[in-house]
Amino acid sequence: MSPSAVSATPPQAVVQGNPDLSADAVKAKLASNGQPTLAALDASKLTRTRTTTPRTVPALDDPIRNVSSFATDHMVTCTWNVNTGWATPELKPYGPFSIMPTASVLHYATECFEGLKAYRGYDGKLRLFRPDCNARRLLMSSARIALPTFDTAEVEKLIKELVAVDGAKFLPKSDAGKFLYLRPTLIGTQAELGVQTPKEAMLFIIATYMPELSETPGGMKLLASQNDTVRAWPGGFGFAKVGANYGPSLMAQQEARRLGYNQVLWLLGDEAQVTEAGASNFFTVMRSKEGKMQLITAPLGDKVILDGVTRRSVIQLVKERLTGSKELEPIEVVERQYTMGEIVEASEEGRLIECFACGTAFFVAPVSKIHFRGVDIDVPMAQGEIGDYTNTIKIWLVDIMYGREDHPWGVVVEEKEV
């Protein structure tokens, strides 16, 4: 079987009873069962239909750029059927598509998605940041909710194609330091009620403008969740990027904003384990009682938090560049369960150094305050608006994303001039 061939085995059979839901593991299981193959997702077959009603690019100061509703001229779509596999992918004008009211996604949350950005570099080039990681995570999420599998390299190619076509117009070279937000999404479209594995699905990829969310004046203020409000739990699906993780969190988020906070700091269990901040991963810099500087974040092993691409990158860069640093005090990366009690104690003892949230949307956002059980915990920020470690990490990532540093994570897209 070729690497891109897709087995007829339904995805739920692949993942049931298997704790290893990595993209590689899913593909290996699919490729080894000897079942007949269906048509694979194949980006080389992409058809292209250019829009006849091109949109006007909004000015840099146009408020429409500060919401995520203004999309570029085109989108990529591809349908899937259990009997035939993947159809021919299409690049076509952005606009509505039709699904039936009985479509699986509308009733049973058979939906997963990714979020990544296309960056206009200071050298004039268009880049993606580690798109292979996003494609692999989309595959993992798809398998978790019994949607079809695919070769991740083909999804990556389709993402690049959309950026290549629309990037030059909507992210011109004059917009150095700006970005477009990309949203690959996979939905179950079978038009039949009933809790069952969808026999039809659709992949689509769109690009929109998005506001800069990492520069909250004074730092982000977080409201710690209550014991009776849980975002994710061991054995659940908090590790997968599925829509069902986000809708149920909106009520708590709305309450946090009503009270003057930016996001919810999601806790778990009676011990108030720290997990995520809003829809972002969360890091704490604190000095241990033994005097060692540590960068602490929740682990992936219990599958409560998302394996964020930014999170993964932060950990890798810190291990490579800060464990023996001369510019900043060397710091140890620690992935473990930790609690709000530890943060409170560190704050009281002067050992709490910094906190930050990170993800594609919020990038690297410093945290200045956490409200926990009636008490405001002030988080130090050495430079007034951002801490030293947070700032250093943010600069490293910006340099890679926008081409100031030549790095394999910054993937150049050969754009098609308009």
Identify the meaning behind each predicted range.
Residues 273-305:
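Glycine- and Gly-Pro-enriched alpha-helical subdomains that act as flexible
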Residues 311-314:
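Nucleic-acid-processing active sites and adjacent nucleic-acid-binding tracks
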Residues 2-263, 267-273, 316-418:
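Conserved alpha/beta cores of soluble small-molecule-handling proteins
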Residues 260, 307-309:
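A short glycine-leucine-enriched loop at secondary-structure breakpoints
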